[in-house]
Each structure stands twice: as structure tokens, then as C-alpha cells.
């Protein structure tokens, strides 16, 4: 079954180069949503939180062909967003959101449901900026425990070790988010295999279907990976799909405002 995938991106630094309260969409929020945004100390964090609310609403309203005002987003106990009205067995509209460094993305698709609950059916997405997480040269060693011996060897043997580190990291995070357990799960238990690593490392910008596969608890996922250049910095995006999905395209829609 071929799936149309919606991939939306908003660069909050470009879209809203002013303080949060001057953003027109801020006034469209409910009182509780505004209070949620106002709790953030830094404007970048507040803008990403605002964009996350709006981009999910925009995505679901597009998929359901309704007004954004009609969309009600809920979250699971683990914090995974969903829209109850988008659950229409034998299919559901599933989506996942991620943000980093002022960039907010959401990916969604209509997927076949699984009443038996015996196989993964959800999408997971993660974005990360490819830059050191600390000033110390040995900062990667602090994260060695989340990688298998083969994965760690791949990181350390590569001339682009920081890229391989973040590629593996974002693939594992995408799987955990597909499962709806986030970092409460153990990334070490996710085994990632790259199929197009050289193309990812040697391209300035690229989007690759089935760039990797991952196995967790006996289940398998395909991972599409996108390498984006934003604000002169490299970002990696991993999107995890159930393996029976056939993806039609790899395009992103960049939103200038919401």
C-alpha cells in the first residue's frame, strides 16, 4: 500500500524574528496553551513550543480536510500526540513532531491500523543539529552506553565520526518516538543498520528513502533520512515507518507562518 506522507517544517527564527507575544498566531491559542508558552524563559524555546502546537493542528486539518479550529490534539500518558478523530479503522492518520535549534518539523501519513496490536503501526521522527554537545574533545565517550559495539566501532572508525554519531542517535530516537516511549526506553536495545551511509556523508543536502533499518524487540522499521543545511549548519532528520509502508515521495513543505 502506497502512503502519501506529509512533511512540514517551520524555521521559527526566519518566520518570527521578534518576541513571542508579537506573533499573530499567539492570540489564536487557548488560555491554557498561552500559559504553556509563557512558562518558557527563552524566546527560542517558546517559539518552538508555539510552532509545535500550530504545525500539528495545521497538519491534521489538512489531512482531515477541516478547519484547524476543529482539530483537537491529545497526548498519551507518555506524551505522544494523537488526534482521536483521525482514527478511522482500518486506517489511522498518525503523526509525530520534533524540534531542535529553532526548527520544528512534523511528519504524518494515513497508515493501516492493526487491531491485534501485534505489530508497530506508528511514525517516529527526530531532528538534531550536527554539532558537539560539549566543549571537551572526548564528549562522545559519555554516550557510548547507548550504542552497540558495532555501532560504536562505526562511529570511531569514520572520518566523519560526529555525523555518524548523530545519524545513529536520531535513528534510535525516531524509533523510541514511534513506540511512544521516548528516552524512557533504552536506545542500546535498538540496532540500526545503514544502507546508504556514504551517500549521506558525502552529500551536502540529500533525502534518502530506506537509508537505514532498525530492529527493536523483534520488530523492524525502515528509516528515511534527510540531511538539511539550515543557518549554515547541518541537521539530520530521521523518520521511522513500519516496514510494510511504501513511501511515494520525499518532499518537505516549508511553512513561513502559521
Swiss-Prot record:
Major subcellular location class: cytoplasm
Q: Which reaction does it catalyse?
A: apo-[ACP] + CoA = holo-[ACP] + adenosine 3',5'-bisphosphate + H(+)
A GO term, aspect molecular function: holo-[acyl-carrier-protein] synthase activity
Question: What are the subcellular locations of this protein?
Answer: Cytoplasm; Nucleus
Q: Which GO terms describe its cellular component?
A: cytosol; nucleus
**Keyword terms:** Amino-acid biosynthesis, Cytoplasm, Lysine biosynthesis, Nucleus, Transferase
> What GO terms in the biological process aspect are recorded for it?
lysine biosynthetic process; lysine biosynthetic process via aminoadipic acid
**InterPro entries of this UniProt entry?**
4-PPantetheinyl_Trfase_dom, 4-PPantetheinyl_Trfase_dom_sf, AASDHPPT_N, P-Pant_transferase_sf
EC number(s) given by UniProt: 2.7.8.7
Q: Main role? A: Catalyzes the transfer of a 4'-phosphopantetheine moiety from coenzyme A to a serine residue of acceptor proteins, such as alpha-aminoadipate reductase. Necessary for alpha-aminoadipate reductase activity.
Concerning its family, UniProt says: Belongs to the P-Pant transferase superfamily. AcpS family.
Q: What is this protein called?
A: L-aminoadipate-semialdehyde dehydrogenase-phosphopantetheinyl transferase
Origin species, per record, is: Schizosaccharomyces pombe (strain 972 / ATCC 24843)
